[in-house]
Amino acid sequence: LPIGLDTQIPKKPYSVVLSVSDKIDTLVGFFGINEKPTSSKDPFALRRTALGIIRTIIENKKNFKLNDLLSYSSSLYQDQGYNLTNQDLQKELHNFLKDRLKYYMKEKKIRFDIIEATISSFSLNNLFSSFEKANQLNKIINNQQGIDINSSYKRASSILDNELKNSEI
């Protein structure tokens, strides 16, 4: 669980932990041997697996220390004698999960500029917090108060730009 954007997610604490741990293990294993999705192929459904991690964390309103989980999972493979050949494993998984979070936010109708602003300060350890900030900002900007604030900002910015241009002449 979950296996898609609209499927059920685990809700009980042990189920949540088990689901996230299992999916982390899957991603570390495949990325560790350089079996990653390409732009056209994802034979092991790794995008769906990453989306499952993201949905489980966000919809249960939890922050996991995913960086620690990724490191620990990688060390478990090493301890069992498996040689993970991918030297950029942590970085690639961080970027992969970041891309999947962007996709998830887009599917939740969060504005592109808000997604980009959120992703610029993204941390795997605060995945839920990152999403929640973007979601709240999206709600504010899309209501009348946000529209008024944005309009006032644009007007003030335009006035300042004109003043700067006139003072340079």
Annotate each predicted stretch with a short phrase:
Residues 1-169:
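Amphipathic alpha-helical "coupling" segments that flank catalytic cores
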